[in-house]
UniProtKB/Swiss-Prot annotation:
Every Protein kinase domain range: 35-328
Family statement drawn from the similarity comment of this UniProt entry: Belongs to the protein kinase superfamily. TKL Ser/Thr protein kinase family.
Low complexity biased stretches: 459-470, 499-527, 562-605, 662-678, 699-720
Protein name: Probable serine/threonine-protein kinase DDB_G0271402
Keywords, comma-separated and alphabetical: ATP-binding, Kinase, Nucleotide-binding, Serine/threonine-protein kinase, Transferase
Lineage: Eukaryota, Amoebozoa, Evosea, Eumycetozoa, Dictyostelia
Residues that hold ATP according to the record: I41, G42, K43, G44, A45, Y46, G47, K48, I49, K62
Protein's organism: Dictyostelium discoideum (Social amoeba)
Catalytic site: D192
C-alpha cells in the first residue's frame, strides 16, 4: 500500500538540473536572418507592417524603431512589452504570436499572417464620402419611397460592395465575442476594440489583434470592480466613461463591441453624429435606427442597444453575448458560399534582405521635369497708320556672309514702301524629348490615414490601406495604386534633329499691296528666331541664365535642373534678338528662353536607339559641340564689335539724312519704282564694307507716338540686297520734322546708341 506521501509528483525545475532537455526561455526569440521580408502591407501607430516568411510560413512582421532619446521611448517600451505579453494568449479568434526579433534600434514582432485584412474594408460604405450634413440628410430620408434604400449593400457610388448575408454578419459578431470572452476570462481588458483591429482569415474567421493597449482587470474587488486607468483607444469606439476620464472596468470593451455591431448592421463608419457630446458621448438611438436595414433580425439589433447602454452595469457580459448569438445562429441558415477575400499581398515574396528598408524610386538628378506646353509660334505683324509698331524692340541685324537674300524682297506697289524681311535661314536645333510617365515617389495612400488619431496597428488601416486604396483610388496594372503622375524627361532620351532652313513664315511680297494712304507697312516676320527649341520641353527658362554680351566669355552649359517655370513666347515685348550661325536665339533680359514647340514630338520606344547611358552620352556630346560653336561665334563678334562701332560713328551721322523726292537706288529690282518715295519721306543710302561683310545699321525709336516739337522717326526700315557683290542699304523713315540727331538724343524722343554702348545686336550667318 502506498501512502499519499509517497505519491510521485512532477517538479518543474530549471534547465540546469534537466540535462539534455531543450531550454524554452528563448522559444519566442527569432533570429533576424531567418526572416524573409516582403512588401509593406500596413502602417500602425508605432511602425510599419510587412508580409514575410518564417521557415516557409507566411507571417506578418511589425517593425518598431526604438530611440532611447525619444520622449516616447518609455511609453513605447511599455506598449511593446504589453503587446508581446498579451499575444502569448492562444485562442482561435486571436492572432497567433510567433516571436520577436531585433536588430540595432529596431524591434520586430512576428505574428501569423491573416490574408483578408481588416474587417472595416468589407463594412464601410460612407467613409471618406459623407459630410455631417449629408449624413443627417440621408438619416432623415432613409425608408422614404422617394429615396433609394440604403440597406442595399451592393451599390456605393457605382461600385460593387461585398454582399454580407445576415448569417455571415452574426457569425462575425460571434467570433469577436468568443475572443473577448476568452480575454475577459483571463482578466484582460483590450481597450481598443474596433473594426480595423479585427482581421478576416480563411473561411471568414475573425481574429482580434492589436493588444498594445491591453491591461489586466481588477482582481479580488468583486465582480466588475472599477479602477482608475489612462484614457486610451479610439474616440468613436471608446465607452463614455473612458472618454470622460471616469473609473472603468472590462465593461468598456462591451460598449466598443456594441459600436462594432452597429457598423456591421449599418455598414457605415461611426461618426460624431451617432455619439454627440450633448448625450455625453452615448449612442444616439434616434440617429441609429433610421440607418438600420429593414431586414435586420430584431434580436441582433436588440443586442446592439443592450451593449451600448450608458450605464456600464446594465451592459451584458461577453459570456452572455455568446449565448445570445449562438441561439440566434440556430434560427438562421449559414450561407454555403462565402464572399471572396481580397489579396492583401502578392506572391512570391522578394528575396531575403537584411532589414526591411522600404524601397523608393531613385531618380537621376539630371532629369528634365517639365510641363508640356503645346503652344505654337507667334508671328508679330501690326499694321498702323504710322507703319509697323515693333513695341520698342531693340533689333540690330548684323548679317555675316549673308546668303539666299532675294532682291525681290522690296516691292513698291502703288507707291507703298512695303518691306518684307523674311528671316528664313534659321537652323533651329530641336530636341524631341521622349515622354515617360513615372510614378511619383510621392505616397499613394489616402493622407487622411497618415494623421489619424486612432493609433492603428492593423494590417491595412494606414497609408497603404487597401481599403482606402481600392475604394478611393484607381487601380492600375499589378494592383498598384494610381498616385500622382509626374512626367519626366530623361536627358538621355533627347535626340538631336536639326531642322535646317526652317522657314516659319513664307509671306509673298505680292500680298503686301496696301493702298492705305501711302502707309509704310513693315512686316518684320522673325517667327521661329529661337535657336534652341525643345519639343515638349522648355530648356531656356532656367534658374542659371547664360549671359551673352560683347565681351562675354565662353558660355557655360545651361543647368540640367528642372525649370522653375515655363513661359510662353511673346514676340514684340522688349525682346533682344541674337542670331548666331543661322541659329537664332531669343534673349529676354539676358536669359536664354526657348520658343514654344510647333508641335509635339511623336512618342516612340525609348530604347530604340540603344541604352539610356549611350543616348545620354550622345546628348552630352551634342551639347558640348553646340556651345563650342557659340564660343567661336562669340569670338568673331568681339572682333567685329570694334569695327562696327567705328563705322557707325563715321557713317551713320545726321548729316547723311536729307530729304529726297526721286532718289533712284542701285538695287536691281523688277519694279522701276524701287526706291521711289513720296515728298513727305526721307531716304538714306549708305554703303559700308567691313572685312567683306555687310553692315546694316538701324535707328531705334523709343516712342511709338510722334511729338510736334521733336523729331521722332517712328519707323526705320532696313533692307539689304546683293547685286554683283555690291551691298546697298535703304533706310526709310516716316515723315517728321528733321532735326539734328543730337537734339533728338537730348530730348529722349529718338535715341541712337552705338553698338559699343551696350546695345544688343543680332548676328546672322
Amino acid at each position: 500500500m502506498i501512502s499519499m506521501d509517497s505519491t510521485p509528483t512532477l517538479n518543474f525545475e530549471t534547465s540546469d538540473n534537466l540535462d539534455g532537455l531543450p531550454d524554452g526561455s528563448n522559444a519566442f526569440k527569432i533570429n533576424i536572418d531567418d526572416l524573409e521580408f516582403g512588401q509593406e502591407i500596413g502602417k500602425g501607430a508605432y511602425g510599419k507592417i510587412f508580409k514575410g516568411e518564417y521557415f516557409g510560413t507566411p507571417v506578418a512582421i511589425k517593425e518598431i524603431s526604438l530611440q532611447p532619446n525619444d520622449v516616447k521611448y518609455k511609453d513605447l517600451t511599455k506598449f511593446i512589452q504589453r503587446e508581446v505579453a498579451m499575444l502569448r494568449f492562444s485562442h482561435p479568434n486571436l492572432v497567433q504570436f510567433i516571436g520577436v526579433s531585433e536588430r540595432g534600434s529596431s524591434l520586430y514582432i512576428v505574428t501569423e499572417f491573416v490574408q483578408g485584412g481588416d474587417l472595416a474594408y468589407y463594412l464601410f460604405r460612407n467613409k471618406f464620402d459623407d459630410t455631417p450634413e449629408q449624413y443627417i440628410h440621408r438619416k432623415v430620408n432613409v425608408g422614404s419611397s422617394s429615396t433609394p434604400d440604403l440597406s442595399d449593400p451592393t451599390v456605393h457610388n457605382g461600385e460593387k460592395l461585398v454582399q454580407l448575408a445576415w448569417p455571415l454578419r452574426i457569425k462575425i459578431a460571434y467570433d469577436v465575442a468568443c475572443a473577448m470572452a476568452y480575454l475577459h476570462s483571463r482578466n484582460v481588458i483590450h481597450r481598443d476594440l474596433k473594426s480595423t483591429n479585427l482581421l478576416v482569415g480563411d473561411n471568414w474567421r475573425i481574429k482580434v489583434c492589436d493588444m498594445g493597449f491591453a491591461r489586466t482587470a481588477q482582481v479580488g474587488g468583486g465582480s466588475r470592480a472599477k479602477r482608475t486607468m489612462t484614457i486610451c483607444g479610439t474616440t468613436n469606439c471608446m465607452a463614455p466613461e473612458v472618454v470622460l476620464g471616469q473609473d472603468y472596468n472590462e465593461a468598456c470593451d462591451v460598449f466598443s463591441y456594441g459600436i462594432v455591431l452597429s457598423e456591421i448592421i449599418t455598414r457605415m463608419d461611426t461618426t460624431n453624429n451617432l455619439r454627440p457630446s450633448s448625450l455625453k458621448y452615448g449612442l444616439d438611438v434616434d440617429v441609429l435606427l433610421p440607418l438600420v436595414p429593414k431586414d435586420c433580425p430584431p434580436p441582433f439589433l436588440k443586442l446592439v442597444l443592450d451593449c451600448t447602454e450608458y450605464d456600464p452595469d446594465n451592459r451584458p457580459t461577453f459570456k452572455e453575448i455568446t449565448e445570445r448569438l449562438k441561439s440566434l445562429t440556430k434560427k438562421l441558415s449559414t450561407p454555403h458560399i462565402l464572399p471572396p477575400l481580397r489579396v492583401l499581398a502578392q506572391s512570391p515574396l522578394t528575396s531575403p534582405i537584411q532589414s526591411p528598408i522600404s524601397t523608393k524610386n531613385q531618380f537621376n538628378p539630371n532629369l528634365f521635369k517639365s510641363i508640356v506646353h503645346n503652344n505654337h509660334n507667334h508671328s508679330s505683324s501690326s499694321n498702323n497708320s504710322s507703319g509697323y509698331n515693333n513695341n520698342s524692340n531693340h533689333n540690330i541685324n548684323i548679317t555675316v556672309n549673308s546668303i539666299n537674300i532675294n532682291s525681290s524682297n522690296i516691292n513698291n506697289n502703288n507707291n507703298n514702301n512695303n518691306i518684307n524681311n523674311n528671316n528664313n535661314n534659321n537652323n533651329n536645333i530641336s530636341f524631341s524629348g521622349r515622354q515617360e510617365e513615372l510614378m511619383s515617389p510621392i505616397s499613394m495612400g489616402d493622407e487622411s490615414d497618415l494623421d489619424s488619431d486612432d493609433e492603428d496597428d492593423s494590417y491595412t488601416s494606414s497609408a497603404s490601406s487597401s481599403r482606402c486604396n481600392s475604394r478611393n483610388g484607381k487601380i492600375i496594372n499589378g494592383g498598384k495604386q494610381m498616385g500622382y503622375i509626374i512626367k519626366h524627361h530623361y536627358s538621355s532620351d533627347l535626340e538631336s534633329s536639326p531642322n535646317g532652313n526652317n522657314i516659319n513664315n513664307n509671306n509673298n511680297n505680292n500680298n503686301n499691296n496696301n493702298n492705305n494712304n501711302n502707309n509704310n507697312n513693315n512686316n518684320n516676320n522673325n517667327s521661329g528666331n529661337n535657336g534652341i527649341c525643345i519639343n515638349s520641353l522648355s530648356l531656356g527658362v532656367s534658374s542659371s541664365p547664360i549671359q551673352i554680351g560683347l565681351s562675354s566669355k565662353s558660355p557655360t552649359p545651361p543647368s540640367m535642373s528642372p525649370p522653375t517655370s515655363v513661359k510662353s513666347y511673346h514676340p514684340n515685348n522688349n525682346n533682344n534678338n541674337i542670331n548666331i550661325n543661322n541659329t537664332n536665339t531669343n534673349i529676354n533680359n539676358n536669359k536664354i528662353s526657348s520658343s514654344p514647340p510647333v508641335k509635339n514630338s511623336p512618342k516612340s520606344n525609348r530604347f530604340s536607339n540603344g541604352s539610356l547611358k549611350q543616348q545620354f552620352q550622345q546628348y552630352q556630346q551634342q551639347q558640348q559641340q553646340l556651345f563650342l560653336n557659340i564660343n567661336e561665334d562669340d569670338k568673331e563678334l568681339e572682333e567685329l564689335s570694334k569695327s562696327i562701332d567705328d563705322t557707325f560713328r563715321l557713317h551713320f551721322s545726321p548729316l547723311n539724312i536729307s530729304p529726297t523726292q526721286n532718289n533712284n537706288n542701285n538695287n536691281n529690282n523688277s519694279n522701276n519704282n524701287n526706291g521711289n518715295v513720296n515728298h513727305n519721306h526721307h531716304h538714306l543710302n549708305q554703303h559700308s564694307h567691313i572685312n567683306g561683310h555687310l553692315i546694316s545699321p538701324t535707328i531705334i525709336s523709343s516712342s511709338s507716338t510722334t511729338s510736334s516739337s521733336t523729331s521722332t522717326p517712328s519707323l526705320v526700315s532696313l533692307t539689304s540686297s546683293r547685286d554683283h557683290h555690291h551691298h546697298h542699304i535703304s533706310v526709310t523713315s516716316s515723315p517728321t520734322n528733321i532735326k539734328p540727331l543730337s537734339s533728338s538724343i537730348a530730348s529722349n524722343s529718338s535715341v541712337f546708341t552705338p553698338l559699343g554702348s551696350g546695345l544688343t545686336r543680332t548676328v546672322q550667318s
